[in-house]
Amino acid sequence: MNTQVWRVCVGVMLFCFVGRIGCAEEKMVREEGLAVADGIYAVMETNRGTIVLSLFFEKAPLTVCNFVGLAEGTLAVCKGRPFYQGLTFHRVIKDFMIQGGDPQGNGTGGPGYQFPDECDPALRHDSPGVLSMANAGPGTNGSQFFITHVATPWLDGKHTVFGKVVEGMEVVHAIIAGDTIRSLKIVRRGAAAKRFVCDQAQFDQLRKRVSAASK
């Protein structure tokens, strides 16, 4: 094999190798959500497609700890089981929001406990794609959440905003009542996100702190 042919073969092999690496990286990014900034993200796979949510763990740590702990099965109530997997969006109101996270599937269920609100004035229901906690009044948060279709400012101060859609608003708009959460994967990027623990001890500590601050 002459030198020129050898160089061509090596070039083709290198191109294919780099291409495979690029495809693997793209697949990993798709599986983990996006090539995004540091933070904690929830990649929600539904029967309509994927919704990627940025979680505001620094401004609503208790609420995010609860959501992530349920999603990953690290809270005592889950016993190692991903809580949200297989649950439905039981309530959908056009031009308002989609609501899910109820193990009963009818709006009456929850994880078996409640925790206080974290209504940071900087976090508002000011746009489509806001992730917020459903409740039955102050201090009744559990596992149910909703994602807005539009801005809903009348909910400010009444429901805890703890995240926002960064990809998949078209999926949010396509969801209908009865659609399913097939999986909910948590992705951590950056040192602060990786230090954010979401186990039962951390949840209990945060709940105690937020409860004391609200008195």
Swiss-Prot record:
All copies of domain PPIase cyclophilin-type, residue ranges: 38-197
Any Gene Ontology biological process: protein folding
InterPro entries: Cyclophilin-like_dom_sf, Cyclophilin-type_PPIase_CS, Cyclophilin-type_PPIase_dom, Cyclophilin_A-like
Species: Treponema pallidum (strain Nichols)
SUPFAM superfamilies to which the protein is assigned, alphabetical: Cyclophilin-like
PANTHER family reported for this sequence: PEPTIDYL-PROLYL CIS-TRANS ISOMERASE-RELATED, PEPTIDYLPROLYL ISOMERASE DOMAIN AND WD REPEAT-CONTAINING PROTEIN 1
Reactions catalysed according to its record: [protein]-peptidylproline (omega=180) = [protein]-peptidylproline (omega=0)
Protein name listed in UniProt: Probable peptidyl-prolyl cis-trans isomerase
Pfam families xrefs: Pro_isomerase
Record-linked PROSITE patterns: CSA_PPIASE_1, CSA_PPIASE_2
Enzyme class, spelled out: isomerase
Record key words, sorted: Isomerase, Rotamase
Keyword Transferase belongs to the record: no
Keyword Nucleotide-binding assigned: no
Molecular function as annotated in GO: peptidyl-prolyl cis-trans isomerase activity
EC nos: 5.2.1.8
Family membership noted in the UniProt record: Belongs to the cyclophilin-type PPIase family.
General function of this protein: PPIases accelerate the folding of proteins. It catalyzes the cis-trans isomerization of proline imidic peptide bonds in oligopeptides.
